[in-house]
């Protein structure tokens, strides 16, 4: 359903999900907002459970694939969260778009196995700036791409390097870094 809210999608006919994109249905307690928030943070938490199993990067290509999948899923979820719950792209008076890295972003959920202390994890659970969130997404997707090198996914339900590169491209397009996209 987020595709309908994208920059290049217009829907003129009646449909069951049109109400989700009306301004009256954007309150914090509305079902779509709650579903998006809960689903995406569940993805982050499940990815963190997998990341927590690894004290260091594994050498086995299958285990590297599992860890790479977890980092890619967390990057993907945070990428959607920042787009749904903050508008990081702003226009100046001339209509030129840019990223305001100082705007409030979203809470980041990380693990102690990544080197964070409990105090740091607690402080990241508050709203971080858009810049901090973008830095975390870029770090996660970069790590995922590195870990997925040489990994052959068993089916299309699993992320491989090409899929992670697609997530990275979407991130860099949003971040207006055309050369990296």
Roles of regions detected by a PLM:
Residues 1-6:
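Acidic, glycine-rich segments characteristic of secretory precursors and extracytoplasmic regions
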Residues 10-31, 107-128:
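Short, helix-capping/interhelical loops that line the mouth of catalytic, cofactor-
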Residues 69, 76-116:
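Extended ligand-binding groove/face enriched in aromatic
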């Amino acid at each position: 359903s987020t595709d309908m809210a994208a920059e290049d999608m217009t829907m003129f006919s009646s449909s069951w999900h049109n109400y989700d994109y009306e301004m009256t249905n954007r309150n914090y307690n509305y079902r779509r907002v709650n579903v998006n928030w809960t689903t995406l943070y569940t993805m982050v938490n499940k990815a963190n459970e997998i990341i927590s199993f690894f004290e260091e990067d594994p050498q086995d290509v299958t285990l590297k694939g599992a860890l790479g999948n977890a980092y890619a899923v967390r990057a993907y979820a945070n990428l959607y969260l920042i787009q749904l719950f903050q508008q990081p792209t702003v226009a100046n008076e001339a209509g030129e778009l840019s990223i305001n890295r100082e705007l409030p972003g979203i809470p980041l959920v990380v693990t102690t196995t990544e080197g964070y202390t409990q105090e740091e994890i607690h402080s990241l659970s508050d709203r971080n700036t858009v810049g901090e969130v973008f830095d975390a997404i870029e770090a996660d997707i970069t790590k995922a791409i590195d870990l997925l090198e040489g990994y052959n996914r068993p089916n299309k339900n699993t992320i491989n390097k090409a899929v992670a590169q697609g997530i990275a491209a979407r991130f860099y397009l949003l971040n207006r870094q055309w050369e990296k996209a």
